[in-house]
Regions:
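Conserved beta-sheet core of the metallophosphoesterase superfamily
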Residues: 96, 101-167
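Active-site neighborhood of phospho(di)ester-bond hydrolases with catalytic His/Asp-centered motifs
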Residues: 1, 18-25, 49-54, 67-68, ...
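Core catalytic region of metal-dependent phosphoesterases/phosphodiesterases
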Residues: 1-56, 114-118
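Accessory, non-catalytic peripheral segments of nucleic-acid enzymes
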Residues: 160-251
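Active-site regions of enzymes building and remodeling cell-envelope glycoconjugates
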Residues: 47-49, 62-64, 86-89, 103-104, ...
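Divalent metal-coordination and catalytic microenvironments
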Residues: 6, 24, 64, 125, ...
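Short, conserved loop/helix-junction motifs that constitute active-site signature segments
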Residues: 13-15, 80-84, 112-117, 195-196
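Binuclear metal-dependent hydrolase catalytic cores centered on His/Asp/Glu-rich metal-binding motifs
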Residues: 59-113, 182-185
């Protein structure tokens, strides 16, 4: 079913515009080889190209390097060195010092300054969208786990002539949200329902409230609106993570 949907999607895209796909590490069967990939089925679709090896294009009078996943950081550095004329790079790279989530940095790969000489570099691989100097980690198009909370997801449109970038945020796919029930008392229920619709919700509840009817009443009113709502009971004296009280999404 998934393969059928994917092929159908790229068939439709191929009828609209040329599609260029670089292989990522989750697409390959062997850890250090791009020879066998899960997206080989797409390469037979008209107007769709799948790249397992680097290739250089001249688009809008700019040298564009498409660099799929390399077997290690040394191989990646070698590929970049072999294409010194590149101006813009589209890649799937592991970069040291890039955030994996809001708090943890990646400790593997090349340093980000390896890309400083380029006009712009767009990379996948790291799910957490972020910008560092010339490098844009585009992230995943939708939230996958709680680690993606509050990190914008979507896709980018780049004008290669002007290098103007337009980000289209994904407001359709489910998101992970976090609320504290004490902060909801003065919020209209309709507003709360609208925000949690189709989303995954962590609801933090002080133990003294969990034993009252307030929690069950709220759950009964909203549980069919969200994808899932999970109450998390805590002892208020032990609550030291101030982030749990942040409900800036509510207006």
């Amino acid at each position: 079913k998934v393969l059928n949907y994917t092929v159908n999607l790229f068939e439709r895209l191929g009828k609209i515009l040329p599609v260029h796909i670089i292989v990522g590490n989750h697409d390959i069967w062997a850890k250090k080889s791009n020879e066998i990939t899960s997206i080989d089925s797409l390469k037979w679709i008209p107007n769709v190209q799948v790249y397992t090896d680097p290739i250089m294009y001249n688009w809008s009078d700019r040298k564009i390097l498409l660099m799929p996943w390399r077997r290690d950081s040394a191989h990646e550095a070698e590929t970049l060195a072999d294409n010194p004329q590149s101006e813009i790079v589209f890649c799937h790279s592991e970069v040291r010092g890039i955030y994996l989530n809001s708090k943890v940095k990646n400790q593997h790969g090349n340093e980000s300054n390896i890309y400083d000489k380029y006009t712009r570099v767009y990379s996948g691989h790291i799910h957490y969208r972020q910008n560092k100097n010339k490098l844009l980690m585009v992230g995943v198009p939708y939230q996958l786990t709680r680690s993606d909370m509050n990190n914008p997801k979507g896709f980018d449109l780049v004008d290669l002539e002007t290098m103007e970038e337009t980000f289209f945020e994904n407001h359709i796919s489910p998101k992970f949200l976090r609320y504290n029930i004490k902060m909801l008392y003065d919020i209209p229920l309709g507003n709360f329902k609208k925000q949690i619709e189709n989303n995954f919700v962590d609801l933090y509840v002080p133990s003294e409230i969990a034993t009252t009817s307030a929690l069950s009443n709220l759950i009964n009113k909203v549980q069919k609106i969200s994808r899932r709502i999970e109450p998390n009971i805590y002892q208020e004296d032990n609550m030291i993570d101030k982030d749990l009280y942040d409900i800036d999404e509510i207006e």
